């Protein structure tokens, strides 16, 4: 099994090692390199990282599974555009439709493909500032000084309405190499 996100690596190593399953930790920029032989993996999981569908196919055994949860292209789009009227999503092609089509074109069987747009609600301006500062791909060039007028508007909305809500964009896939 392969994984790139450290909290998942720790969890998978702890839970799966007891069952004889080897977990391969990948570097952050791994989408074009998996350190295993072609046709050698029973399963590849992916939590939010970019991936190369052809490489996934090459590394999986026939009948192997690819399971991925992704942050879609439109995650927090309205809030990102509020701060930057020229904002364009960093990963505009990361959609369920395109990802499913890419995998089907490579011969994968799609066992599960679901998307969700849950709400995320902010109850104070500090939470918005923190959130925007830790995900620069959705809030490029964000800073309090640069976005002070928008932050003031959002703070007033929170004072009037108790909160500000944005939409997240998520999808999950479970596939099998045929």
Spell out what each predicted region is.
Residues 51-68:
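A short glycine-rich, Lys/Arg-flanked "PGG" loop and its adjoining helix->strand segment in the class I
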Residues 71-90:
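Short, glycine-/aromatic-enriched active-site segment of Class I SAM-dependent methyltransferases
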Residues 109, 115-178:
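Conserved Class I S-adenosyl-L-methionine
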Residues 9-10, 53, 76:
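Short alpha-helix immediately C-terminal to the canonical SAM-binding loop
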Residues 84-98, 138-141:
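Acceptor-substrate binding/catalytic loop of class I
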Residues 1-34:
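Class I SAM-dependent methyltransferase SAM/SAH-binding core
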Residues 40-48, 65:
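Short SAM/SAH-binding signature in class I
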């Amino acid at each position: 099994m392969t994984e790139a996100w450290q909290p998942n690596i720790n969890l998978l190593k702890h839970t799966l090692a007891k069952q004889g399953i080897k977990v391969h930790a990948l570097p952050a920029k791994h989408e074009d390199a998996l350190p295993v032989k072609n046709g050698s993996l029973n399963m590849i999981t992916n939590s939010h990282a970019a991936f190369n569908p052809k490489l996934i196919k090459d590394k999986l055994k026939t009948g192997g599974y690819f399971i991925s949860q992704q942050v879609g292209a439109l995650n927090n789009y309205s809030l990102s555009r509020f701060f930057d009227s020229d904002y364009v999503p960093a990963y505009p092609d990361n959609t369920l439709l395109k990802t499913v089509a890419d995998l089907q074109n490579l011969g994968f069987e799609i066992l599960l493909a679901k998307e969700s747009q849950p709400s995320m609600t902010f109850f104070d301006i500090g939470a918005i500032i923190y959130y925007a500062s830790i995900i620069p791909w959705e809030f490029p060039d964000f800073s309090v000084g640069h976005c002070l007028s928008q932050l003031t508007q959002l703070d007033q909305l929170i004072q009037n309405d108790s909160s500000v809500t944005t939409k997240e964009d998520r999808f999950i896939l479970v596939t099998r190499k045929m």
